[in-house]
């Protein structure tokens, strides 16, 4: 589904994908009470989920969390700032990673469900982005946000592990987005090449362009097959999921950036204008190389998985 939506509009594909990202920690490690409460509401369309991991000083270095959660009786009190949060201000629920024991680094983080209506939750202005402009991205501010103790996801200290397990699965969603936007750009480029005439014949008759289109199609299908292979491992919970999730995301997003750029080239000057959709596809594709871990970080993840 993500692939097919992204084939037309990547911003729209973020609606289901971010809800998967935000709710998956509850599915993976939440108590039965949390699952019944929040996943039921999500399934009924009563509120969406966002995922709050990134911070101003914790991008690729996700372990460098500054948001704190402190016990106060039976409650937790959260303070901090989360950055680059998709659907911030729109979603009703937020999976928040916060430090509960600063001495333990990654083993001192925990995951919580924070509700939009909780006192002390506020949001920044929408970011002015290169692409995916139809999807809001904002900061989330937590100012003495008090939540009941039963909103912790999993056990105290398991937050970082839960966050990383979540990304193993959801990076495949990003790969699917990348395949979709690449396929959409290829579709448009093919149609244009058959209709656009220069030198008295369709530009698709030019062998140089044929080779470009062939490479685009080959790369898209290779990315699709790797993404589907990774998706199968996600469903089965295979041991090599970490490698396949990272490799699918990395390869498919690199393909998406190349194919959408090539699609602009096929359309020439027209591709550079907003009268045609490929310039938007090219701008949208860029984020797939960045979010849920840059492709440089994906290569670190893959190498560690191989050398383990």
Give the ranges of each region predicted by the language model:
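Conserved hydrophobic/aromatic beta-strand scaffold that supports enzyme active sites
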Residues: 50, 66-68, 75, 93-97, ...
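A short, Trp-centered hydrophobic/proline-enriched beta-strand micro-motif
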Residues: 45-53
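Flexible, small-/acidic-enriched active-site or ligand-binding loops
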Residues: 64, 117-148
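A short core secondary-structure module
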Residues: 79-123
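Short Ser/Thr-interspersed hydrophobic loop/turn segments at strand-loop and sheet-helix junctions
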Residues: 2-6, 98, 114-119, 143-146
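Helix-loop "lid/cap" segments that line or gate small-molecule binding pockets
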Residues: 20-29
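Short Gly/Pro-enriched turn/cap motifs at secondary-structure boundaries
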Residues: 57-60, 84-87, 101-103, 129-136
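Alpha-helical interface subdomain recognition
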Residues: 1-13, 29-34, 45, 61, ...
